[in-house]
UniProtKB/Swiss-Prot annotation:
Its EC number is 2.7.1.16. Keywords: Arabinose catabolism, ATP-binding, Carbohydrate metabolism, Kinase, Nucleotide-binding, Transferase. One of its GO terms (biological process) is L-arabinose catabolic process to xylulose 5-phosphate. It is an enzyme of class 2 (transferase). One of its GO terms (molecular function) is ribulokinase activity. InterPro entries: ATPase_NBD (IPR043129), FGGY_C (IPR018485), Ribulokinase (IPR005929). It comes from Yersinia pseudotuberculosis serotype I (strain IP32953). This is Ribulokinase. One of its GO terms (cellular component) is cytoplasm. HAMAP family: Ribulokinase. Pathway: Carbohydrate degradation; L-arabinose degradation via L-ribulose; D-xylulose 5-phosphate from L-arabinose (bacterial route): step 2/3.
Amino acid sequence: MISADGAIALGLDFGSDSVRVLAVDCQHGTEIDTEVVYYPRWKKGLYCQAAQNQFRHHPLDYIEAMEQAIRQMVKRLSEEQRQHIVGIGVDSTGSTPAPIDEQGQVLALRPDFADNPNAMFVLWKDHTAIEEAEEINRLCRSGEFADYSRYIGGVYSSEWFWAKILHVTRADVAVREAAVSWIELCDWVPALLSGTTAPQDIQRGRCSAGHKSLWHPSWGGLPPRAFLAALDTSLVNDLDYPMFTDTYTAERPVGQITAEWAERLGLPTTVILSGGAFDCHMGAVGAGAQPYTLVKVIGTSTCDILIADDQRVGDRAIAGICGQVEGSVLPGWIGMEAGQSAFGDMYAWFSNLLSWPLHQAALTQPEWQPQLKQIESNLLASLTCAWAQNPSLDHLPVVLDWFNGRRTPNANQRLKGVITDLNLGTDAPTLFGGFIAATAFGARAIMECFEQQDIPVENVLALGGIARKSPVIMQVCADVMNRPLQIVASDQCCALGAAIFAAVAAGAHEDVPTAQRHMACNIERTLIPDPVQVVRYQQLYQRYQQWCHTAEPHYAPVTKAIH
């Protein structure tokens, strides 16, 4: 153990668009400084085809943005503060895997794969592997093998590890022949900084392995060779089998920073790297989550985390969620994951739709661009304000929040968004009110998924930019869920959670609960449900559910006729 007094831990949060670094005082939890850097290639739209649901990140985006963010922030610290940095923790989106060669190099870092999207990190929201996910689900339910989807909610998603590997392996012969393994982003960054990227040296995180890779101790780790070979023999012939057997909780040290990376980042060579995990899981820890608190990490999508004890769960498999994994959030507790595939992304879509004439005007009248950009940037806030001033629920359109598929309950990425109950009196603010209600209805469906299976939801916490900046939206969530909604007083809970794990790995705190007591974030305010609105939203929620049951069959896979 080292003294927490004066010690500083860094949390690295790799998001969809940018990386954030946060420096935190290990003793008092003070957020000392932060820096955000956007991924340059991603910002240009490179390697992505939205119409085909292809979203890829070049590893150089992560490296360059991370290096710039850490160096810029460290420069602002005093020399004494720099020398007191003891650890780095890492969280990332997920599942965001990439293929690696026998040296552990991500293929896109090699000249022969530098511009090949299949050699890059396949971002969480890439849905190119829908058919492969359905193959995995069919095999799990075939009776030929044990149901290896049992502990991930019973449905394997196209957003996850094996589906993406299977898709890329079949789509790209060169990548298939060059890759010997795949690695999640949250595992790769600690390995990169500690010089442990060789496949046999990688410390695989319990969080990513348990929630996305079908790893579970009851069947000895990953599914058996025969199961993967039944999907595609390349999974066991071209790739190492097993890719890994052991997994580690995030407070376990991965290693010490290499001399090269210490110099590049301006850090002491004594810095310890803790294990990686997904952003929402570490965000729950940063928010100070306790058992049976539903933590909603709200951004472009949501990830919902709930911690339960093994005695209550027993050997039950909770259906419809994104996994139940011992140690994925807090060591010794079962971490349960759920989520909505689109939350802020739905609002952004609506804003982009309404902004089309602004973009056209900017093309024809370039001198108007500053004013038009200002109008566009204020559009969502203006819509929210206009609807809040007259939140009529009598003619509120019912919207299904499946614009990016559905993650929970019961993952189905074939689903599409649906807008119903329009009339000639429906204006833009009213329709946007329908969008707000839809995201709240999706949140309630997740809560009910837990409660209907005897997993109680005793408290609800919300964190992220939308949670803090949009009280109207959060009040609707409180009314729809009919629960007090606690808003966490930080926009950086994911990075804060990563810093908490770094502090434990470095020895500044004995365990994660102790580190949470010193470092976790406070509650900023609590929103109370309005009883009158609760009744009205209950009626709308029932109509939402009716439309869900009506619409879903229309997105079932089309059976091809045999001639």
